[in-house]
Design a protein with these regions (language model features):
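HKD-type phospholipase D/PLD-like phosphodiesterase module
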Residues: 1-21, 31-192
């Protein structure tokens, strides 16, 4: 185990691992912003996918900030899969349905996925308190969280990958293309 104490070290480790992945990258985050960090992370994953790496992403629905076109463009890449955990708040959900979900299914709406994992080739992983947003990597000019991550190898990585797989196959994790398929957005102005 190696502790990634600073935002710079944590970002650099993720970037290096993404650039050196040869088979798979599996990531799970509660928050994925469309700020500097979110864009850098998305670009790193897309570069890996372009090299033939299979990329799978799970993000909690409550805090996805990415526009529809952004999510769909990434998901259209043949080597990228994006699933949204418990999609009742934002992704692919019309506004009137969001309000109805909150009013009639508070328990179901409140079930969240708070994991933060970055697993490369099933051999190396990063986990900790950082979400994919500027304020978790010391990039916010007004406020930054003080978080740490751990870089892991060995059995801990295998256990994290098994947990990722359980979330990936959960009925609560829905493919982003499925969420948009019925709304006419799937092929509208989306190019990779």
């Amino acid at each position: 185990m190696y502790v990634l104490d600073t935002g710079f070290d944590a970002l650099l480790a993720r970037a290096w691992l993404a650039d050196h992945a040869s088979e798979t990258i599996e990531v799970q985050y509660f928050i994925w912003s469309t700020d500097n960090i979110g864009i850098l992370a998305s670009e790193a994953l897309l570069r890996a996918a372009e090299r033939g790496v299979q990329v799978r992403v799970i993000v909690d629905d409550l805090t996805v900030e990415a526009p529809d076109k952004f999510l769909l463009a990434l998901a259209k890449h043949p080597n990228v899969g994006i699933r949204i955990y418990n999609p009742k708040h934002s992704v692919g959900t019309p506004r009137h349905k969001r309000a109805l979900n909150i009013a009639t299914d508070f328990r179901g709406v409140n079930q969240r996925m708070h994991d933060k994992t970055f697993i490369v080739d099933g051999k190396v992983a990063i986990t900790g308190g950082r979400n994919m947003a500027d304020e978790y990597f010391d990039y916010n000019s007004e406020y930054n969280f003080r978080d740490r991550d751990a870089l892991l190898v060995g059995q801990a990585t295998k256990d994290m990958r098994a947990t990722f797989e359980r979330f990936w196959t959960s009925p609560l994790s829905v493919d982003v293309e499925t969420l948009y398929a019925g709304r006419g957005l799937l092929n509208k102005n989306v190019e990779v």
